[in-house]
Amino acid sequence: MTLTRAIGKSAAWVVGIVAVLIAAAGVFLFTFDWNRAKPWVNEQVSAALGRPFAINGDLKVGWRRPDGETGWRAWVPWPSFSATQLEIGNPDWAKTPKFVTLDAAHFDLAILPLLAHEIVIPSIDVVNPAVDLERLADGRNTWTFQFKQSSQPSPWKVRLDSFGFAKGTVTYRDAITKADLTVAIDTLGQPIPLGDVLKEQEQTSREASAQRVGKRGAAQLSAKANAEAASSASAAQAASAAASSGASAATSMASAATGTAGSSASSVASASTAAGASGASGASSAAVPAKPSGPTYAFGLKVDGRYKNVPINGTGKLGGVLAIQDTSRPFPLQADVKAGDTRLAIVGTLTDPMHLAAIDLRMWLQGTSMSHLYQLTGITLPDTPPYATEGRLIGNFKRKASTFRYENFNGRVGGSDLGGTLAYEQREPRPKLSGELVSNLLQFSDLAPVIGADTAASKAKRGDTTRQPPDRVLPVETFRTDRWRALDADVKFTGRKLVKSSNLPITNLYTHIVMQDGVLSLEPLQFGVAGGTLATTAHLDGSGAPLKGRFTVAARHLKLKQLFPTQKVMQSALGEINGDASLSATGNSPAALAATSTGEVKALVTDGRISRLLMEAAGLNVANVVYEKLFGNNDVKINCAAIDFVATNGMLDPKVFALDTDDALINVDGPINLRDESLDLKIHPHTKGFRIFSLRSPLYAKGTFKNPKVGVDAGALALRAGAMIGLGLINPFAALIPLIAPSNNRDVPCSELFGQINAKAAQKAAAKAGK
């Protein structure tokens, strides 16, 4: 009995002591001034981060009952930690001393999961977080921490169930990309479905497109995008109907299991766009569409600053912080940003945002000129008129091997449509751009900026500072060959119809553009025009300075009647133009290439009619004045015109330059200087038999392309004004023989012209031999 009593008393003492200890611990925990522990906490966290850490305000610890727990677990309280004025320091080399500052932070910690080596934070809230990110030119950055390394993986796991904050800012400075950005972030108040954001962005972006390419162009762009989206939606509905009937049950179950159904941002985009298109066309349905149950946005942001020295400002939206941790769900993002004169908008999803796995976005792009994208992206594109595009951007991120596809996009460039797919591949030593582009209706004027031949107003609009000299015709704007070495390209382009004027359509334009290590080639560049074909090749080597170029042109069966459809005088013409050119040159602009060109240019024109009005319509100032001097206002039938110029370092010398009419045989001699765009030509008319011809003295054409001067050379009669071109040659037309019947084996009415000049050449050769 004594032993039992002793044991009982001992047990009572033990229980009492434990109770006292628990009570004392409780009193200690609830009454302890945790600010005394701040030095120890600061020291431990600083050591773990490898950066200075400090709690400059109060540190408090409280206790509360857990949420969502039942049974005895509901009686195990959670510690609740609060701190104010927290900061993490930056490395010594950083421009600012603080990496992160928080006005306040509060989080709970679940106790029981600690027994299983799991840190569960039911909720964390921060107030006014500010993050400062910086990267130097040598690659050092402030967001890389030097944590203690361990050869063994940590047995601990971390889980965050809820995260909230009010108003945060992120500053980003990058010496490599020349970025200096400030991003303000805040909660949206309530989640916004991706589909709702898509519809809003679609309307906003199409209004922006109208500002660039006009309301009509934007409407055509929208109609085409809506039609394709409706087609995609119809295909999706058909597939869904087949699946619901049981034909594809297994596939549907597999898709559901892998989470592919509804995970694509483009699927949401297509469905939304199709709905808009259906509504616009007046279609109605009794069923009320269900609210999208896909990804939602939780945060809004505003960005301002500079990127690659280009001014940046815009807005955006992001998914919740917890969604970042879930690799099985797409993370939504949206942005509408203006960079200089370029505007970019995206709506879609990011897969595994912690590791930047992939993107699937709807993208809108508008700008003054596509060449301006080079500064932002490093992608070399030509100068263009204002443009707007809309399409799907998909991409996969890999270290130094990322790939992106702008898929099935539609666009407007000036007054032309443009569509297709472009792929960008990150690789060494240079990235590569490839794809196929198609234009159903291409305006000829929209091609002028590509070679710098657009108007001064157009150049000013796209920001080109090159001034075309007032006395020069050939474009002096230089090729940006330094950009050619930044990117390789393999792009095929088809223009189904190219319009210079409504009466002269060019059809079936096709070119294959290849750029490799600064060497650009268009082989071939061909199209149909005026019932014939024009085939060219261009090879531009920009790998060194100056640029080296090689060009060939072959014109076949260009019908005069179709070439000048608005000129009545030509409607009775049955002839055509055939020609060839082969030139090589060096220079960094079209004018410089012309000034150094070497090669040959030859052409035959047969069975045509010309008038002074035709010369004016063609913009041939010199020819117009010469025509008036020779023929007055009369229409003239051209039996044959033959041209064969030899180019030597920018000097064009005519081997043959002759014109055969019913009344006269006219030949031209003298050089054309492409270096200074000057002329020194003499035009010699020779009457046929006793036919009356008003002018028997030769004419001269001097001056420049821009300011030509034409007059009568009264010092010599036509019959004594030097022999016809080629009289010292055995057969000056030998080089033109291939053009007489290029492919159709029809006779060309040039026999009289050829015969007369060849006869005179033979007479002169015989006279020389007899001396």
Model regions: which residues?
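Intrinsically disordered, low-complexity serine/threonine-rich repeat tracts
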Residues: S205-A210, A219, N226-S285
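Outer-membrane beta-barrel and related beta-rich outer-membrane complex signature
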Residues: L136-D138, Q375-T377, L447-I451, R609-A618
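N-terminal type II signal-anchor transmembrane helix
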Residues: M1-N56, A735, L739-D747, S751, ...
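Terminal hydrophobic membrane-targeting helix
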Residues: I22-D138, G395, Y700
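Extended amphipathic ligand-handling, pore-lining, and cofactor/metal-binding catalytic surfaces
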Residues: A603, K709, A718-A721, I725
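Solvent-exposed beta-strand/coil patches in large extracellular/periplasmic or lumenal scaffold regions
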Residues: Q146-A175, V197-Q203, E207-Q211, K215, ...
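Generic short beta-strand segments
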Residues: G57-V61, T84-P91, P129-V131, A166-T171, ...
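Short hydrophobic membrane-inserting alpha-helices and related fusion/pore-forming segments
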Residues: R720-P742
